[in-house]
């Protein structure tokens, strides 16, 4: 049972200490979107994200109202793009599809324009990495990352 003291303490944190929930994240697998045609891949990625996350912002806002604590960011995290883009010759197309999906759903940002190269760097990873500057300059909501090492895998020195 919640006590009066706990309620007052929470109200104090919200009012005086600006308590908030920093981020809620919806994780979406894109493995079902794989295609040997990059335009089809981009369309499938957009459609899947837009459909899956269509209610994310609304639900986040409902949670804010229900618990009385602001949620600063609503975001989407997807399968690392390099894992689904083996046949893509222009990865920026995929970046733009991700960005359009973020805009359509109303989220603050979308992560997953990423490569996991801790165990080596196939051609798809290299193409994606080379495209990051262009992708970030031509999108509004996209976040990108490169994983170069882990405790288990070590660091790939190539």
Regions found by a protein language model. Name each.
Residues 1-130, 150-157:
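Metallocofactor- and cofactor-centric catalytic cores in central/energy metabolism, strongly enriched
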Residues 136-157:
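Cap/lid and interdomain-hinge subdomains that line or gate substrate/regulatory clefts
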